[in-house]
Design a protein with these regions (language model features):
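N-terminal secretory targeting modules
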Residues: 152-171
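Alpha-helical cap/lid subdomain in secreted, periplasmic
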Residues: 1-134, 138, 142-157
Length: 171
């Protein structure tokens, strides 16, 4: 996790051999166990967080600064980049949702993508800039299918060719 809290934080700058690094946990807790069980692991970079200023070069793009607080110093870094590096290093397919969502969010702007996000009330101030609703999830699933079809992963043979782009409908 990228939060600067002792129980949650993983260092985005460490390699898969560095205990406590983000890559270490992805490899040890997900990739290696999946491979041991005969599964084909796939890494997916995180979607960007909706940003009212349309800036995805910082935390909205999962790029953090080094933080020092009462619990210690937490090294910053680029989590999507760490996932991509791990995929290359371990020969695991990586689907880049960070870039896909960043491109769409920059093009449409914060107002243009608000219908993809969860709302806790009817007020626009209640939009959850991190979590998506059903429509946003369908859009992200479409990105995953599209990215998988472009990959060299054998699992692409199980994806419907030319999946239909999700359409937004008012509830």
């Amino acid at each position: 996790d990228e939060r600067p809290e002792l129980g949650r934080y993983t260092n985005p700058g460490g390699s898969p051999s560095v205990v406590g690094s983000f890559q270490y946990y992805l490899f040890e807790k997900y990739i290696q166990p999946a491979k041991e069980r005969g599964a084909i692991p796939i890494l997916v970079t995180p979607i960007v967080r909706r940003d009212l200023g349309n800036n995805y070069t910082g935390e909205s793009g999962h790029i953090t600064e080094t933080v020092t607080n009462e619990e210690g110093t937490f090294q910053g870094g680029n989590y999507a980049k760490a996932i991509k590096q791990l995929g290359v290093g371990k020969s695991v397919t990586v689907l880049d949702l960070t870039t896909r969502t960043k491109d769409v969010y920059e093009r449409l702007g914060a107002q243009g993508v608000k219908e993809r996000h969860a709302w806790t009330s009817q007020r626009e101030a209640s939009i959850d800039n991190t979590h998506t609703n059903q429509y946003g999830a369908a859009c992200n699933a479409w990105f995953i299918a599209d990215e998988l079809l472009k990959s060299n992963c054998n699992l692409k043979n199980y994806v419907v060719a030319n999946p239909q782009v999700p359409q937004f409908t008012e509830a």
